[in-house]
Amino acid sequence: MIGLPAGTRVWLVAGVTDMRRGFDGLAAIVQTALDINPFSGHVFVFRGKRGDLIKVLWWDGHGLCLFCKRLERGRFVWPQAAAGGIHLSAAQLSMLLEGIDWRHTVRTAPSCAA
């Protein structure tokens, strides 16, 4: 994943997105569904109907970037909400991109060295 500047927020756009949409179509969804400026520098993540493809829209200060990832097996974990946005941490975004369930992470207890 590309390093994000400090203070960058990550938003999952709930619901199903038409993955045929490109820069302008996804930016319009950000404006209407989340009421956030897509040129704010925050990261916006969209998932299609099948669940194996996500798109990430990000303004890097010079232009819009659009990243896509398709899982070879399985589906990306997505919230049940039909609309709106859900804030993720950068760590949760990394887990999402790896196909890990970012909602139920468990920290293991450190082992005791005797």
Residue spans of the language-model regions?
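Polybasic/polar functional segments that serve as interface/processing modules
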Residues: 1-114
